Amino acid sequence: MGVNIHELEDYIHNIEPVTFPHQIPSFPVSKNNALQFPPPGSKDAEDRKEYIPDYLPLIISSQEEEEEEQVPTDGGTSAEAMQVPLEEEEEEGEMEDDETVNDENYLSKRPLDSPETMEMPFAKRIRLMNNKGDILDGSLEPREPLSSINSQKVPSVLSPAHKIDSQDLDVSYSDQIMLSPVSKSQAPPPSESKSLIPKTKSKGGSPGQKIKSPKATPISTVIGSPIRSPKSGPKERKSPGCAKSPKSPKSPKVPLAAPPPAIKTETPNRTPLATLSEKIGRENIQIKQNQTPLDSDQLNVEIPSKKPSIADNTIEDSIDAVIARACAEQEPDPFEFSSGSESEGEVFTSPKRLNISELTTPKVSASGINPGKTSSTSVPASGGTSSSDISWTMDDSINEVIRKVSQETPTNTPANNPPCFSSPSASPPTPEPLLKVFEDKAKLPPPVELKKKTKKEQRAKKKKDKDKLKDKERSKDKNKDRSKDKEKDKEKDGTKDGKVLWKDSNKDEDSELHRFKLKDFNEIDSKSKQKENCGKKDKEKHKDKKKDKEKGKKDKDKKGKDKTKEEKMKSPSTPIMLSSKDIALPMISTPNTVRLPSLLSSMSPLLPEKLFEEKEKSKEKDKKKDKKEKKKKKDKEKVKEKEKEKKEKEKEKEKEKKEKEKVKAELSIPAPSPVIPRLTLRVGAGQDTIVISKVVSAPESKAVPPPSLPKSPPPTPSPAPAPVLVVPPQAPPAPAAASPAPTPAPSALTSNAGSSKTPVRSVVTETVSTYVIRDEWGNQIWICPGCNKPDDGSPMIGCDQCDDWYHWPCVGINAAPPEDEQWFCTKCESKKKDKKQKKRKHKAH
């Protein structure tokens, strides 16, 4: 072989040692891990809620995974995106069932393959979430800006557009205005949004999304002032992700309307564009409304002024057609829109709602354009808000929601109005955009957090939305009767206007216009709280739902009161309501639109500054104060009630005493029977009249006086201070002095029926012994110590010393003793004997 043994040994020892023939077990022995702990950097670990232990797998339904995979493709087409929300509504029922099983209740182990599949959908979800969040950020932000559209900045850019196309341009113009303010609001945070956006793009940004974003950006640029457009551009880049959401489908259409000339072209083509935009926009709107019917309801409340204009249009016809279309197109992924937009929409349900109502309110072309633009821009805003919900405090999110709602309500009406030929100036609530800009800045950092949101949260939000919808539907049914008359009037005016109005929006608008005028801020607060709590435990969610229901009930009860108060507070908003009605007509006539700018201009400063600040701050404080005050009031009321009860009892006692005294006086007057003579003793100042009645047989009447007199003296001393009667043993002197008629007194010794009636015998004694009981009327009842039975009316004899009264049979007396003799009971006699004996002993000594 030519191999050197030493070299071979050296080789084996130093270079390639021979493996030991037996396997050496390495401890601890590794086991297959079926617990699927999320890797430290995975989204699962970030999204996992605190109350879910690490060893439990994240539960995601297979439907969600499939839907998420489909989402990127569906997001590209507007029709599919439109369909997605409708499917979401249909599938929400199924999803809820699946969710209950998969998300929370499904504890069985998953196959080892599931983690990988889980991770892929998660990445997609993150992208979708981010994209949707971005889209929501863009769309919601624009929606906020839409409401806060600065009339000053927008009119310059938009005014030409209005001139170009009176109606179509107005619609598109309003859309542009809506978008431009959004872009402005977004513009301050664009750098932040950009930093967040790249993450979203890197994670899930698909080329389609990027393409969509440019579309959204041109629209925003065209719509907004050139300064706004660049800012809106980056946010809309976020929106590209948003483009996937049903809102994004609108965005492609938006590009058509984006350039003012394009808008002009739309005006001639308005009918086809309107039809397409109506179909898509309506479907999207319906889907959005269905997905976030609560949001739409809130929007209706928030945008009551917009809704009236929408209601003016022939809503029912268009709604029926749209519903049919939406039902046909419901197949697209429900999660595509719902996962991103709904969750975010819930965070800022008011902005989405506003966008939906706005999209629907503008004419068909506007609906097509606005949905795209607003959706692209506004969606990022919602996304930002949703992420901000996680990062922000409850108060911040509530304030933002309130601001957005308040801003959107006035601004949305203007936005709708400009399409109605209102001059571009009509659209500008300038103060709102500033507020939104700050809110957007605050919100931009949170978009990254949107990634953290899991589909569980989205599902929970969907469930909440459904619950809210149910509650609202109930309240709507009640309010329908009231709103029917108004709806009829509005529909008459609205028939002249666009067909884009939806039944859902109309019904919700009319019924909710009433509700939400009262509930705008209350519900916004409660809903914003719910949105913020979405990231919290499901238990808290259920509690929030219950609270919302209770609040809704309370709000209904308080509608009458709240209407008067809010009408005073919202005097500017009421003009908007009128303007919206006028606006429906102005779609044809410009003069009404002229009214709008003035109303809007007045509205914008009043609502955002006063209503929002005062209501936001005052409501939170008022709630806390109210709770404390209620507790204090309850405690005070309890104390007062107790005091009142005590006083009442005392008064009643005093009354009873007075009545008793009166009854006694009255009873003392009539003689119970001729056989029972009465001895009336007036004690002291004659306040109490003591009647001592004894039933005596005629022959005994002569001998009766001595025992009867002892009976009278003991009662007299206690009630009155009369000193004359104080000496009980001396019976004869007392009656002689106190009673003018001593002759009847002897016969009064034996109390028969009269004595049995306690009210007749009001005998009071100082020597209260165990044998004297007071009845409920304060009268004394004598008990015979011999037989322990109360005075039953049979003749009794009283001891002149201890004032105990005995039945004659108990003492062995058959006939009344002589009047002059004193009678002592056995106890007193024994005591006297003892005393006499002691005296004798002392004398003897």
Swiss-Prot record:
Extent of Basic residues compositional bias: 452-465, 624-635
Keyword Glycoprotein in record: no
Any one GO cellular component localisation term in the record: transcription factor TFIID complex
Protein location: Nucleus
InterPro entries noted in UniProt: Zinc_finger_PHD-type_CS (IPR019786), Znf_FYVE_PHD (IPR011011), Znf_PHD (IPR001965), Znf_PHD-finger (IPR019787), Znf_RING/FYVE/PHD (IPR013083)
GO-annotated biological processes: positive regulation of transcription by RNA polymerase II
Zinc finger boundaries on the chain: PHD-type: 781-831
Compositionally biased residues, Acidic residues: 86-102
Stored Gene3D superfamilies: Zinc/RING finger domain, C3HC4 (zinc finger)
PANTHER family: TRANSCRIPTION INITIATION FACTOR TFIID SUBUNIT 3 (PTHR46452:SF1)
Function: The TFIID basal transcription factor complex plays a major role in the initiation of RNA polymerase II (Pol II)-dependent transcription. TFIID recognizes and binds promoters with or without a TATA box via its subunit TBP, a TATA-box-binding protein, and promotes assembly of the pre-initiation complex (PIC). The TFIID complex consists of tbp and TBP-associated factors (TAFs).
Subunit architecture: Component of the TFIID basal transcription factor complex, composed of TATA-box-binding protein tbp, and a number of TBP-associated factors (TAFs).
Protein family according to the UniProt entry: Belongs to the TAF3 family.
Name of the protein described by the UniProt record: Transcription initiation factor TFIID subunit 3
